[in-house]
UniProtKB/Swiss-Prot annotation:
PROSITE patterns to which the protein is assigned, alphabetical: SUBTILASE, SUBTILASE_ASP, SUBTILASE_HIS, SUBTILASE_SER
All residue ranges annotated as the Peptidase S8 domain in the record: 131-421
Regions annotated as coiled coil: none
Superkingdom of the source species: Eukaryota
Encoding gene (name): SUB2
Signal peptide range: 1-16
A GO molecular function held by the record: serine-type endopeptidase activity
The name this protein goes by in its record: Subtilisin-like protease 2
Pfam family for this entry, one: Peptidase_S8
Amino acid sequence: MQLLNFGLLLLPFVAGDLAPQPEPLLAGPSDVVPGQYIVTLKEGLTSAQIRDHKKWVSSVHRANLDSFAAGASGVETEGIMKHFHIHDLNMYSGGFDEKTVEDLSRNPYVKSVHPDQHVYLAKTVTQRQARWGLGYMSSKGKPVPLHSTLVDYSYDDKAGEGVWAYVLDTGINVNHIEFEGRAILGHNAIPNKPHTDEFGHGTYVAGIIAGKTYGVAKKANVVSAKAFDTGSSTYNYILETYDWIVRNITDSNRKNKAVINLSISGAKYQPFDDAVEKAFKAGITTVVAAGNDGKDAKNNTPASSPNAITVGAVRWENTRPSFSNYGKLVDIWAPGELIKSCWKGGNNATSTQSGTSAASPHVAGLVAYLMSIENLPSPSAVTARVLNLTIPNLVKDAKDSPNRVAYNGIQERKFTLPKYY
């Protein structure tokens, strides 16, 4: 079975270090959650069949627990824990003994059984201030000064109004002044933890999407969907949170006015790629980070999800940072090095960070921006529009990636344009 080590994608830097060492891509044995699994059911099952399957699982699990063989494993298990339903994809998490796992693997209703996994956050440190990223988004990829605070960012003044950006991350400081009351708490999957951002990553990502100063879509709403805390998570929580997001978008009739940002990455893990793909088929757009391993993104999840918008990082002078993943599955490049945004620790706190965690929300913000000014009826239309606006052949060392950088199209629009300084 393939294992996955997820991490949030901001990189550790020291001054002058532009080639940091990435976190390990593959998980070690200690990363597996003992006795805990993610089970994916086959498609086409009826509600009655799923109910019967759950009853069967409970019965088999109880019988195995009562046997000597199950007790000898030394792992206390609790059976089915949570169920996830994304479009027509049905999955559940559970704590099972080895015998029950064997029984599940042979069950005709089961597509796959994968061990659950701890998910780790990448370390971050504060950097000098920089504002080049926004100016880059409206400059057709023209190189911009790294440390300038007078870079123009031109945009339509609808600026994401009426659109909802869902940030699956460490939470968001919804009281930060950058959000002007447009950020709300949605779902917290972490038990016995408050729905606050103690790590900073989620607030940072949300600021790039929709902050009044640092955001691409300055009037968009942002929803905090907390699947990480201060250092680790598991698929049990990530899938629960992603499931909640898809349901909330669907129930709120926001499919054409919502985008999900996933600034996370790890080794290829099919169950989560399947979840992202099913959300796409349900009419929901997901933007994901390419990953920080300096390798081909085809080996990463969710970067390898075929219909996610996968984002690599580009520097201010149109070069690929050595950390950014690349490859044919990278759809687009966006600013991802020395990007300033909101941070933890106060309602006006900021930090400057690097990584594909910063690149992805630039494009998620662009999606929100375009949704507010154009009629984009489906994820396919969203992706086509974003890619149609890109500027080609600018990124140096893009390797075999599609070479196109993000652009908001403003120079082709006939509006009175506000400017950001």
